[in-house]
Amino acid sequence: MTLRPLLLLLGLGAALGILGGCAEADEGAVVLEFWAMGAEGEKVQPLIDRFEAEHPGIRVEVQQQPWTSVHEKLLTAFAGRSTPDVSQFGNTWVAEMQALGALEDLTPYVRQSEAVDEADYFGGIWDTNVIDGRLWGVPWYVDTRILFYRTDLFAEAGYDAMPTTWPEWIEAMRAVQAVQLDGGYPILLPVNEFEPPLILGLNTAELLRDGGRYGNFASPEFREAFAFYVGLYREGLAPATSGTEISNLYQEFDRGRFASYITGPWNIGEFQRRLTEHQGDWGTAPIPGPTAGTPGVSVAGGASLVIFEASEHKAEAWQLVEFLSRPEVQIEFNELTGDLPPRASAWEGSGLAADPYARAFYEQLGRVRPTPKIPEQERIAQTIRTYGEAAARGQMTIDEALAALDADVDRILEKRRWLLDREAEG
């Protein structure tokens, strides 16, 4: 045998010996595959190390996945019966995967759990994972939208706090515009964002009717919210521009061109880092409600933990979900990522509930509503954005936009109606 093949064989033998040693070290251990996305996938490992230390018979392989492609990858994995044991899930995906039969029903697990207590979770967030009375995911972190605003400009206009009703809110915006520099706007509502018209609509209406078969956007209830939204542009209180047309949101907010903005918890850190001239002159507030005595609601967002039905290690997978759901672990997760916990006890134990910027999120999370729990919801949200933008830019009247929105959503739901009708026929 020549020297080169001999060296290759020796190298292969050494490699196999190393692998054999690893296999021996892990012999008997259950290996869980856990998909986590974005920053969570990058930062969760210290918690996984703690879990493995507490559960020496379980090893967790974290696979970091990009948000931009993971949805398609999950569908491909389901088709190929190669789904992970546990995965982080955007809350709007739960209905789609549940309809495919991809998810394990977690209802019986929670009933027997001492770690996962439904009463400790924000109700609207928990409800995002409940379909047909069964639980398909456990909230991991929460997201919603509230108002970030320049407290000094509102105070100069005569408002020491953000109003709590729509009529007062619009009066406050008019007063703020009077004290802003020329070209200023009391609120920024980028027309390429679906969240503002969606949130306002959730305050007054059910988005779908007849059991989720048809759009409900031309209804008087949704029209009230949509007219309020479009009116902000037509009165010049908000610019009819997209986020991509604004070179630097934080600079414009700092110099007072925009006095308020509906956004999410990630911007607490961004505002703290990027505002220079007016670092002490901003605050947060819940979304105002349509009328007195009707507190404003916002959208229930965030991510949950699911177990796939195809997992061969469901008991161990549930142990991981339970561990990541413990309040003290959620507090550490918040410190690692900045993500907001879904459990009230984690807020209280961490001091987040008293934080001057986060406490408005804490208050708002007690008043959130899920979007329709159907697989088509993401397409519906983008359709709301399309016609919201058309009306905001003056390309369609309110009634034209709502009629077109209903028609498009009805087309999106055509297959759903067919399936529901077939099911009803037996």
Regions found by a protein language model. Name each.
Residues 131-140, 145, 167-215, 258:
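Extracytoplasmic/periplasmic solute-binding protein
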Residues 23, 59, 155, 363-426:
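Conserved C-terminal helix/tail region of periplasmic/extracytoplasmic solute-binding proteins
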Residues 111, 265-279, 290-386, 418-426:
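C-terminal lobe and pocket-closing loops
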Residues 173-177, 212-243, 287:
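Glycine-centered hinge/linker elements that transmit conformational signals in sensory
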Residues 91-146, 170, 199, 281-285, ...:
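Hinge/lid segment of periplasmic solute-binding proteins
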Residues 84-85, 114-153, 185-186, 294-298, ...:
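A structural signal for short loop-to-beta-strand junctions that line the ligand-binding cleft
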Residues 28-39, 58-63, 85-86, 187, ...:
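Short, well-ordered beta-strand elements
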Residues 50-121, 130, 155-164, 252, ...:
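Extracytoplasmic "Venus flytrap"/periplasmic binding protein-like
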